[in-house]
Amino acid sequence: MRLLPRLLLLLLLVFPATVLFRGGPRGLLAVAQDLTEDEETVEDSIIEDEDDEAEVEEDEPTDLVEDKEEEDVSGEPEASPSADTTILFVKGEDFPANNIVKFLVGFTNKGTEDFIVESLDASFRYPQDYQFYIQNFTALPLNTVVPPQRQATFEYSFIPAEPMGGRPFGLVINLNYKDLNGNVFQDAVFNQTVTVIEREDGLDGETIFMYMFLAGLGLLVIVGLHQLLESRKRKRPIQKVEMGTSSQNDVDMSWIPQETLNQINKASPRRLPRKRAQKRSVGSDE
């Protein structure tokens, strides 16, 4: 009975080994075949991916060419080689916020045909993307004919918004014109990044309001202190002390004539005790 568990353990160990030895090379070949088939499928998929990438790379140049052609067709009009433009800022290239900025644009016709200058416009744009408008100013209609070998000067002014102070923006100034054949041209007279300056001189609305508020607050403090002092004075009434005349020296007798003073002094001597006693005796007799 003790040997049965040992025999069962040996059978469990020996049986799998015999199965493996019997299957031997065939089993190994089957495993190898499966591995090779998997590798072939992986290689095929890699080759297909490379072919797809090559096709995409071949298609990309054609797409870029098409995009460039579309941009050329749908792009904005360019400047004419027969015309020149110049710009001059009246107060220098300083752009104070909430203040007028003036500039002059000169147009020179170097060709043999007339040019019709239609309009002049300006706009602030996002510095990183000039297609994004921040502030678009009103276009100035001109409709001026400039003959060949002649010049013309145009004035334009705009006011940067006050909240734009202290920030950089792209300033674009365009001059739009055409020839007698109807060909439209546009010259970017100015196309640079500028900084709008915060306005420091003068008083703005916020500063005035702050001063008015401080003045009103100071007035209220003064009125409050005055009322407080008045209330304290009312709570402590002044005690009136009656001062009598202790002697004639305290009485001003200068306004009384001297004769009258002499009579008063004679008529009001101090009564003697004898006279008082006589009066008392007379009264008792009665």
Swiss-Prot record:
Residues 268-279 have a biased composition (Basic residues). This is Translocon-associated protein subunit alpha. Heterotetramer of TRAP-alpha, TRAP-beta, TRAP-delta and TRAP-gamma. Interacts with palmitoylated calnexin (CALX), the interaction is required for efficient folding of glycosylated proteins. The modification Phosphothreonine is found at T260. GO terms for biological process: cotranslational protein targeting to membrane; positive regulation of cell population proliferation. The keyword Coiled coil does not apply. The modification Phosphoserine is found at S247, S268. Pfam families: TRAP_alpha. PANTHER family: TRANSLOCON-ASSOCIATED PROTEIN SUBUNIT ALPHA, TRANSLOCON-ASSOCIATED PROTEIN, ALPHA SUBUNIT. It comes from Homo sapiens (Human). Its main location: endoplasmic reticulum. Shows a remarkable charge distribution with the N-terminus being highly negatively charged, and the cytoplasmic C-terminus positively charged. It is a single-pass type I membrane protein. Belongs to the TRAP-alpha family. Disulfide bonds: none annotated. It is found in: Endoplasmic reticulum membrane. The gene is SSR1. GO terms for cellular component: endoplasmic reticulum; endoplasmic reticulum membrane; membrane. The keyword Transmembrane helix applies.
